[in-house]
Amino acid sequence: MAALALLGFALSACGGGDTSDVPAAEEPAAEEPAAEAPTGDPIKLMTVTTLNANGPTYENIAITANLAAEYINDQGGINGRPVEVIVCDEQFDPAIAATCARDAVAEGVVSVVGSFTYFAESIVPVIAESDITWFGACCPISPSELTSPHSFNIGNQPMYAVGEVKRAVEDGCEAINAVIVEGADAIFRGPMENAMTAYGKEFGDVIITPTIAQDYSAEVARATTGADCMVVVMSETPFLTWNTALQQSGSDIKQYGNQGNLNAISAKGAEQVTDGNIISGMYPDISTEPWDEYRMMLEKNNVDQVANDFNSLGGMGTWAAYMGFYQIASGIEGDLTAASFFEAASNTSSLDLGGMVPVLDFTTEWTDGLPGYARLFNRSVVYSQLSNGQVIPVTNDFFDVSDLAMGIAPE
């Protein structure tokens, strides 16, 4: 079986809470009573992602899924029952992704939560037959994720790429080139070009880069020709190679990139050329208030936040997904099953995650928007930037880019 079940997961045997000393002259502060430990049959959830593959992997998703389960169980579980997470590694193989789907059905999971895979088309139709939802995805890229009634996306992909165009134009960029990693152009290029049209512009060039490359010098040379800015959609690993080539090129072109990929890891060694780069994303920076509990869990478990980026689509997206599931599931009276959760999610008109994303309405599809994107409920972006190789927030305000994605000029 490609899935690994983890219950009550802790990343470090020596992880702990606050150990600061209390002055002897003071009475210790009264602690809030601990929540009663959950009991009974576990509520099984699955998270699907890539952990072992020759290409991008997403350990931050698996780690966060288990941290979220631990957090929920620390609060007493869901209506008194513990949460059990099954992490399924699809190994960047559609056949194994299909096995994950069958395992979800066989294990009786209530929902597949906070997942990212390039092969959701091998999963969503299979689990939907058993009323199992595909809940809270950050980054939908397959038709089923964007159209199936059993898909409840919390992230906004591909809208952050539209946000890159918006910010580049508003920053005064005159000549803009686009760089999109191979395989992503099918869902990103159209909305990005629509946004350019809305501003009365068009890309000077659109460069499609290979997913895996040892050197992007040729592509960088093309992207920096005849442009003062470029908007880039790329995963973290190729972005590292890209930024290295950009630094070596000596170009001073301004770059706009996507959250969780244009980051401290991919900017390492290229701090000079990436300084001031703008990051368009789905979620406010991890340093902000909506993520207080997430940061607490990372610190409590002594998670290595250098090896993996948790200020990212995978990290924050998975946490938001689990908190969304927690909120909806906690309000269900009676048995919590795949079918009852599907019904509850379908009737949720105001999912408020405290600023992680805008308040979401799962009862209203985007039927008057881009064809094929009906289940994209979040269409707003938020911005950060790179400063000396570190990501810092620009604003916590969300900007709706629905109209730009359809080529409608801003008023």
Give residue ranges: language-model regions.
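C-terminal motif of bacterial Sec signal peptides marking the signal peptidase cleavage site
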Residues: 10-13
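Beta-alpha junction/loop-to-helix N-cap segments that form part of ligand/metal-binding clefts
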Residues: 15-19, 56-63, 75-145, 154, ...
